[in-house]
Every structure is written in structure tokens, then in C-alpha cells.
């Protein structure tokens, strides 16, 4: 499931201007968004400083991002033998330079990527009779 989802995501990311507009690309400094496949770690709080980010990188150097919801879903899927893949739109680098308007990022960037990704993923599934 991960490989197929990554391929769909790569297609969705090809033209950020078409998806979110030049204004959104400029506002959030988006440059050549791409898919990263690897380890997501789960936590119970936002990582918002360079010191916190560096400490996590020392402890878990293979981690690509920190998220707060997916681990519980992944555990249930594992327990029941259901395939699972998590997809995240990364809003910042988890450091002191993180932009402050997360709600705007969700509205302008993440929601549009999510809608396009889910739509493309569903369009590629076989029809149910």
C-alpha cells in the first residue's frame, strides 16, 4: 500500500501552482514539494524548538517527522492484520523558524493536497460491483 500511495502522492505534488496557486506557493515558500518515505514517530505534543528537534534527531536519526495521531491507528491495523500507511503534509521543520499561522497553512496547502491525494487514490481503486 505504501508504494502505491507514494506514487499517487508524487503525481499530486508535480504542480503545486496548479493545486494551491502562485500566491500560496509564495506565501509558504513551497519549493519543489516531494514525497519522503520512511519513519514517522509519534508524540504527545508539538515539537516547536530547534533544541527539541535536535534532541529527537540524536535519539532517532532515521525519523523523518513527528506526528500525534497515526500511531494508535497503525497499532489497531497491525493487531487486526489490516494494511496501513500514513501520509502527512509537513507544515514546518519543527524548529524556531516555524511559521505561526497553522490554520492558514491547513486551509491553503494541506487541505488541498489531502483532497487531491484522496481523490486520486480512490480513482485508482478497482470498482466494487
Model-inferred region functions:
Residues 1-5, 33, 49, 66, ...:
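Generic structural signal for well-ordered, non-membrane alpha-helical segments
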Residues 1-60:
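Mid-sequence, gly/pro-rich, charge-dense loop/helix-turn segments that line enzyme active sites
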Residues 6, 71-74, 78, 115-119:
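Predominant activation on well-ordered alpha-helical scaffold segments within soluble catalytic domains
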Residues 12-13, 31, 76-82, 121:
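A structural motif corresponding to the C-terminal end of an alpha-helix
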Residues 43-102:
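A C-terminal functional module that forms or caps the active site or interfaces directly
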Residues 94-129:
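His/Asp/Glu-rich mid-to-C-terminal helical/loop segments that flank catalytic regions of hydrolases
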Amino acid at each position: 500500500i505504501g508504494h502505491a500511495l507514494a506514487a499517487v502522492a508524487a503525481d499530486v505534488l508535480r504542480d503545486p501552482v496548479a493545486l494551491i496557486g502562485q500566491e500560496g506557493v509564495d506565501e509558504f515558500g513551497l519549493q519543489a514539494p516531494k514525497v519522503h518515505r520512511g519513519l514517522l514517530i509519534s508524540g504527545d505534543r508539538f515539537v516547536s524548538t530547534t533544541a527539541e528537534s535536535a534532541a529527537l534527531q540524536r535519539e532517532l536519526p532515521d525519523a523523518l517527522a513527528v506526528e500525534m495521531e497515526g500511531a494508535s491507528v497503525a497499532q489497531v491495523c497491525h493487531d487486526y492484520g489490516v494494511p496501513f500507511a500514513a501520509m502527512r503534509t509537513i507544515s514546518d521543520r519543527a524548529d524556531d523558524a516555524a511559521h505561526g499561522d497553522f490554520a492558514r497553512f491547513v486551509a491553503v496547502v494541506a487541505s488541498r493536497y489531502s483532497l487531491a491525494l484522496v481523490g486520486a487514490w480512490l480513482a485508482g481503486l478497482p470498482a466494487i460491483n
